[in-house]
Amino acid sequence: MKSQDVRKQFLDFFESKGHTIVPSAPIVLKDDPTLMFNNSGMAQFKEFFLGNGTPKSPRIADTQKCLRVSGKHNDLEEVGIDTYHHTMFEMLGNWSFGDYFKKEAINWAWELLTEVYKIPKENLYVSVFEGSKEDNVPFDQEAWDIWKTLIDEDRIILGNKKDNFWEMGDQGPCGPCSEIHVDLRSAEEKALVSGKSLVNNDHPQVVEIWNNVFMEFNRKADGSLEKLPAQHVDTGMGFERLCMALQGKTSNYDTDVFMPLIREIETITGAKYTTNDVTGISEEQNKMNIAIRVVADHVRAVAFAIADGQLPSNTGAGYVIRRILRRAIRYGFTFLGTKEPFIYKLVETLSEQMGDSFPEIRTQKALCSNVIREEENSFLKTLDQGLILLDAVILNNTGDTIDGKKAFELYDTYGFPIDLTALILSERGLKLDEEGFQEQLQLQKERSRAASKVTAGDWNVIVEDDIQEFVGYDRLSQQVKITKYRRVESVKDGEIFQLVFNATPFYGESGGQTGDKGYLEAQNGDIVYIIDTKKENNQTIHLTQSLPENITGTFNAVVDANQRAKTSSNHSATHLLHQGLRKILGTHIEQKGSMVRNASLRFDFSHFSKVTDEELLEVENFVNARIRESLPLIEKRAIPKEQALEDGAIALFGEKYGDLVRTIKFGDSVELCGGTHVANTSDIWHFKIVSEGAVAAGIRRIEAITSEAAKEYFESQAVSLAEIKEALKNAQDPVKSILALQDENAQLKKQLEALLKDKAKNMKADLAKELQEINGVQFLAKQVDLNPEGAKDLAYELGGSYNNLFVVFATAHEGKPMLTCYISKEIVASKNLNAGQVVRELGKYIQGGGGGQPFFATAGGKNVDGIGEALAKAVDFVK
């Protein structure tokens, strides 16, 4: 059975059972501070389990793109090593929100597996929760009794809290679960060892395929459980594992989910993959298989994340995506011999394979490919640089063990993979101080955890089952009651309180727009300031540094009108900017992200070349023309999404929209948007682009200002121009005067360079007398009174006259220390010397660094006082 048919039959089955089929949510999560990515099928329905919203149907089914790489569900280091873990995977799921419970969930799961998919009953085992004295939760007798009617009792297994009690996190909805496991071993293997003994024991052919979670409890901050007001069902079935079972394979990677990618990797790299049924393979072949599995898995995770709007970066979710991609690159580099980018080429195959089920991977194909290629180029350079640095560490090492601190520095500062370090050391007969490395890694993790630790108390509920109303589109103040609150403590923010109101005029941070600030006024006039507003799990959270004295009273919630006006001005300007870019650069332009603050706006968009100054001016003029036209805001609320799209509204990629949406229209600009906006474009006053640049391959970023910030910008420019005129003695044409000064300066620089070259030549004879012969090397380390360019000329002058030369010159031109190293080419190889390594090592003494070629390199720094020590240490390289 093909994977496309497996997916379709699942959705068709649950549709026949009265379930509404919904699309997958984006793999990247928004408005949930506890998760970076969708790591399970239920993540997009979390707000319903928490009671913060009502689903469109009490019965829902879907296939959800998931990513598991960090936290509780950390599978990253296992991926590729075994045959059934993945970073990105599909989770087939069906849900009941206060509707059916255990009986229907279990019976339907059994019906689908045994009657539709026709998995033999004798290949299946199930588990039920054995109970927990610690939590005072009894054995799940109900689930056991249901299973008894479907399967022999000797195939029902009792599971402990670890395996059969599912929790959303440290706090929140949870409950017992019942897992279904499939035994894919041969008849001969089954005769030798019972499958029952292998369930939940990490056997590659006895694996869990479906988990039915019965949500009936809430875990409180103190660890205790309380009953939920309604019972829910949350099930998840691993699509890749199901395909393995239905296609008669013993590895997920041998199914048609992965084999097209694997065959393409073979074609590109020349490597060969052996499927799981091939036995007796060599260790070298096993390593190659692992590398191919890693690449095939990771390109899916990275491409889907990029397609959903998450670019690789150095922080947060972007850093996780970069880590995944770099793991794939280094496996290719180490075990497949790939020294050039190749992973980006797999996006085409992935698009062909999965584009029908997930159209975003097809529409964003070019972006995914370009971003991955740029990341590959960058990291391959890092690997080359790391190899040079590792060579320097090895060269300066005494003994047969490399210090773990040194290895950690390569890993942490330069991004050089520790497993690659260990491999290279092993090849050279050296050992890695793994204990020292792990110690440094653990210290870093502890520092990171301590810095980001957040402790949240339980919600103190004042009003049960209250639905929050947002009134902030229409007014900036509202009489409110606090419905619940809690205390939160973090290293970053200290103690703060989170408040939820029955109604709020405050806009919570979402959709790229920052949250409102303002205050809460009690009836006696006491004020509590609201320092920020967030949107979490479909509820607006108001952050304060203290609680009102009478928490159950009635308050006037007031938004800071000035900040809201500035933020709204910038948000409306992003819509006009988007329209202008599409008009002037082309309709290929797509918004890839934005940040709207009260002070400025940032807009990321797809475009594969730098936007010229002329184009930027044209875009700026377009937006300002729309502002001068005084276009009124035409807003439509709660209209069907299909109708909005038919009316020409633009939907932003990576955003999750409900069935009912809001549209914002200014003239011909129409977008789906939940943010706040000006009533008329004239309220924006003026739009000014202040910067344009690249964010990633194919992604450009414009930063701009409007309103008061634009006025302040022009006032500042006027002051600067006046100061320039004054400095030029009130020249009538300051531009002409500046160009004349630049021309004069260039002539003087040329004269100065000629003088310095002459000075260097004159110094050559004196310095030649100071050369010392050490181990067959003509050595000199000295500070010279030249600029860096002069030091370079001097080094080359000496190099042209003397063989076996090793010189290090230091300069302190304009207070900036600089080191210049020249090594004769004949001793670079014979003495295993490298100028780049030399300046990197000596650069530490001047608080800097640098690099270059093996025979010539430079390093800059900040500490002039370190020059003496750097020069003194230079001789160690030739001793």
Swiss-Prot record:
Entry-linked PANTHER family: ALANINE--TRNA LIGASE, CYTOPLASMIC, ALANYL-TRNA SYNTHETASE
Cofactor(s) the record lists: Zn(2+)
Designated gene of the protein: alaS
Name of the featured protein: Alanine--tRNA ligase
A GO CC term assigned to this protein in UniProt: cytoplasm
Alphabetized SUPFAM superfamilies for the sequence: Class II aaRS and biotin synthetases (SSF55681), Putative anticodon-binding domain of alanyl-tRNA synthetase (AlaRS) (SSF101353), ThrRS/AlaRS common domain (SSF55186), Translation proteins (SSF50447)
Keywords: Aminoacyl-tRNA synthetase, ATP-binding, Cytoplasm, Ligase, Metal-binding, Nucleotide-binding, Protein biosynthesis, RNA-binding, tRNA-binding, Zinc
Cofactor notes: Binds 1 zinc ion per subunit.
Claim: Zinc is one of the keywords in the record: yes
Organism encoding this protein: Flavobacterium johnsoniae (strain ATCC 17061 / DSM 2064 / JCM 8514 / BCRC 14874 / CCUG 350202 / NBRC 14942 / NCIMB 11054 / UW101)
